[in-house]
Every structure is written in C-alpha cells, then in structure tokens.
Swiss-Prot record:
GO biological process, one term: nitrogen utilization
EC code: 3.5.-.-
UniProt record similarity statement: Belongs to the RutC family.
Name this protein carries in UniProt: 3-aminoacrylate deaminase RutC
Group of enzyme by EC: hydrolase
Subunit structure: Homotrimer.
Task of the protein: Involved in pyrimidine catabolism. Catalyzes the deamination of 3-aminoacrylate to malonic semialdehyde, a reaction that can also occur spontaneously. RutC may facilitate the reaction and modulate the metabolic fitness, rather than catalyzing essential functions.
CDD domains xrefs: YjgF_YER057c_UK114_family
Amino acid sequence: MPKSVIIPAGSSAPLAPFVPGTLADGVVYVSGTLAFDQHNNVLFADDPKAQTRHVLETIRKVIETAGGTMADVTFNSIFITDWKNYAAINEIYAEFFPGDKPARFYIQCGLVKPDALVEIATIAHIAK
C-alpha cells in the first residue's frame, strides 16, 4: 500500500530531508519532533516541561491530520539530553497519555541544537 505524507497546516520546514509524518497501512510514523518555532529556533530553552508539551502538541497535530488521536499511539522513542529532566518530562508526558500508556524507551544523547532538551518520535496505529 502506498504511503501518504502528513504535513499539518503551519508546520515549519524540516532542517533535513524528511516530513513530519507518514501514513501507511493505518500506521502513522511521526518523525523525531523537537520544540522548534516556524524558523527552527529552539523554544523554551532550559524548560523541559514546556519543551515536552510543545513536542507532544506537535505530535498530536500530525496524528490528528492523519485521522487519529493520541489514544492511537503505540510507541514513543524519547531522546533526552540530561537525566535530571526525566521527572519533568514524565509529568507532562502523563497528561497526554492518561489511559493505557504506549510502549516507549528513553535514551540520553546530544540533540541537533544545544538548547533542545527532548525529542520524541512516535508510532500510532489508527483504527479503520
């Protein structure tokens, strides 16, 4: 089955050759998402909660553009720059997944911009 490119209205141009999301066979693949403004500047430097909220709101827009909801999320890959932000990120994360939680993993690493604190890539299965 062919894939569909998912680009929500108002999305900024990516820094590299990719799109915000793709849809294939009822599965939405959301690219790694950071807290960027329309010009790819990092938002909310030094605020892991605000960055996480912005990232998850952006992911929600991609999934909703594809016809799904956050309840359809089955897996998240979470990249953080410092373990000291783990609890703050989890606090906001829990607001977006109040029911059954998706599977996920965390990894500490450097991100594309120094002020970025969290990046999340997502997979969602949309019921037909």
